[in-house]
Amino acid sequence: MSEIILEVQNLKKYYQQGTLFQKRESVKAVDDVSFVLHRKETLAIVGESGCGKSTTVKSLIRLTEPTSGKVILNGEDFTSLKGKELREARKKLKIIFQDPYSSLNPRMTVRDIIAEPIDIEKTWKTRGEREELVLETMKLVGLDPTWINRYPHEFSGGQRQRIGIARAIILKPDIVICDEPVSALDVSIQAKIINLLKQLQEELNISYIFISHDLGVVKHIADRILVMYLGHVIEEGSCEDIFNHPSHPYTRTLLNAIPTIGVEMSENTLIEGDLPSPSNPPKGCVFHTRCPFAKEECKLKQPEVKDLGNGHHYACILNIENESE
């Protein structure tokens, strides 16, 4: 296994509710999340909207400060860095945003959008050097260099996302966070963007944290998968293990919901009920209110994490293979 470049330890993000004189229970958006990321690896974080996957990523890169926990980046405690040290470390962490339409400034040319990170960090000495870096990056992501003076409105969604990707990689970061980078694109364009991300990973040795609710997309890019529900990690494993041997009932339901040509979706593939409020999560197992296999014991205590070997583990008191027979 390649070297670990990111380690997240017991990360929590709670939001305080109420007023100065009347406190209420905190919203536990992220609750005790831990994982590692290896060099040149793609870790997908999946789950329904509201499961905590985006807040997890915002907390680990400190767009919002975590309540507690540690983030170790390249052997350094990223959560304790301040000022110049924090700014320096952030050069190694970049984001590709979900919406290629709203994430690009309509008043800026392609040149200035892609050059924004190197302008902020002042990594070039001459205008010629800046131009060369931008053109080189445009070629890497499959953009015609003659488009350098154009504006975002002149491009399709896929081309705009390539501009966003170019902006993210121009500083040659170690880690790129992909926040649902293809969800706003047509299916035919999604495949091209996924292939581009894989190509860039090979060429630049990038590691990805890939946030998605679409396991059909995740299957084509992820090395490992982290399944989240209501701020908790409920299953983690290699892409192969998660797809071939899903062990948590929530994971199984997500996989069953992937559309398949020629196969009708049954009612059993749907999760009953709504996602509970993170300000008032269920006692015991957080999934028991929607789980088709839930027992009385599930309501009383949090499940221990079961290790299935090869980095595959899940949090459930049940042996799901036996329960589903």
Stretches found by the model and what they are:
Residues 61:
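Helix-to-loop junction immediately C-terminal to a conserved catalytic motif
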Residues 69-77:
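Conserved ABC transporter NBD signature motif
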Residues 170-174:
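A short, proline-enriched helix->beta-strand linker immediately N-terminal to the Walker B motif
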Residues 3-4, 17-21, 26, 238-325:
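Short catalytic/signature loops enriched in Gly
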Residues 151-155, 159:
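Conserved ABC ATPase signature
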Residues 181, 185, 189-266:
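P-loop NTP-binding/switch modules centered on Walker-like glycine-rich loops
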Residues 77, 128-146, 255:
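Conserved ABC ATPase "signature" region
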